[in-house]
Regions:
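Conserved helicase/translocase motor-coupling segment
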Residues: 196-199, 211-234, 239-298
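Hydrophobic anchor at the beta1->P-loop junction of P-loop NTPases
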Residues: 30-32
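Post-Walker A helix-loop "phosphate-sensing" segment adjacent to the P-loop in P-loop NTPases
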Residues: 48-59, 89
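Signature of the SF2 helicase/ATPase Hel1-core->accessory helical subdomain module
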Residues: 135-216
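Hydrophobic positions on the alpha1 helix immediately C-terminal to the Walker A/P-loop
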Residues: 41, 45
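N-terminal pre-P-loop "Q-motif" helix
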Residues: 1-26
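Inter-Walker segment of RecA-like/P-loop motor cores
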Residues: 86-136, 142
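Conserved lysine of the Walker
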Residues: 38
Length: 298
């Protein structure tokens, strides 16, 4: 965890404390573009919450970093609340992932991790009505859907009606907000790409409907791309046609193809790079996927 991620995580824990100690509903909205570590923050907070009762009374003094001290102090406060107000009953937590493929992956990660993380925590949007949740985390909340161009209208309609909502008027974000006392949303409006995804205005309108206590947070540091935030902003400017001036960025190539086959060929050439060796071998007919599973990246 970076200092920024740790700070946002600690602030969200404080949001949760405020929600429960003041017996109100609360929302934490975390904005961050791709590669800023939203998933890392989500899992870290969930892990901390699941192990809150194991926090020792004198553990604050073990840390030199102020953020770590604040986080432990917040968790101790939360522990006191759980012991006194909930008779030691842990929070019921759900981790909503809208995308089925990614949901299966994270479910397996939780299964292998243990330490309070269990695969049943990882759920889809339709599952929020199946349990009484205290806290719901939603990764990629920009992928929450409305009733448009779906593969399963039946499950959408059924879930909506269970909550007393009109299927034609509601959306999956509204489901989530109805099903927990505190909701933590990780959001990037630029990653809403399907016609079924909520638009930025639809998302905001839904929040306005429920956000009596809305806390804003932001992850700014780009962790996935060497070019960092300036590179991301430059690409956004190009895609939005707000910056037409050519800019040379060190260690990056800009290639324009008029033949998709040449684009694919160039990508395959690059796949010899680290972590893509398996795919490169398969693409070039050197072996089947099953034959290169044991290949080690050096």
């Amino acid at each position: 965890m970076t200092g920024e991620q740790n700070e946002v995580g600690t602030d969200i824990i404080m949001d949760i404390i405020d929600t429960f100690t003041n017996d109100k509903k609360g929302i934490s909205l975390v904005n961050g573009c791709a590669g800023t570590g939203k998933m890392v923050v989500a899992i870290s907070i969930i892990n901390s919450l699941m192990n809150t009762l194991d926090i020792e009374e004198d553990s604050v003094g073990e840390f030199d970093d102020d953020i770590d001290k604040q986080k432990i102090a917040a968790l101790k406060e939360l522990k006191d609340y759980i012991l006194k107000e909930r008779n030691g009953k842990p929070f019921k937590i759900g981790f909503v992932l809208p995308m089925p493929g990614f949901r299966r992956t994270i479910s397996n990660v939780f299964k292998e991790c243990g330490n309070g993380l269990v695969k049943d925590m990882v759920i889809g949007p339709c599952d929020v009505v199946k349990e009484d949740y205290d806290i719901l985390f939603v990764d990629e909340s920009h992928r929450l859907s409305k009733r448009k161009n779906l593969t399963g209208y039946g499950s959408f309609d059924s879930t909506s009606r269970k909550l007393g909502l009109d299927p034609n008027e509601t959306n999956q974000l509204e489901w989530v907000l109805n099903c927990a006392k505190h909701v933590v949303l990780f959001y990037d409006q630029y990653q809403a790409v399907k016609s079924s995804d909520l638009t930025a205005s639809e998302y905001q309108d839904t929040l306005n409907k429920y956000s009596v206590n809305l806390n804003h947070h932001e992850l700014k540091t780009q962790m996935r791309c060497k070019g960092g935030a300036p590179y991301i902003e430059y690409i956004k400017a190009i895609m939005n046609c707000t910056n037409t001036a050519f800019k040379t960025i060190e260690n990056y190539d800009f290639l324009l193809f008029d033949d998709p086959n040449k684009l694919i060929e160039e990508i395959r050439k690059k796949m010899i790079n680290i972590r893509y060796v398996k795919q490169w071998l398969v693409f070039h007919g050197i072996g089947k996927q099953s034959q290169v599973k044991s290949l080690k990246i050096i």
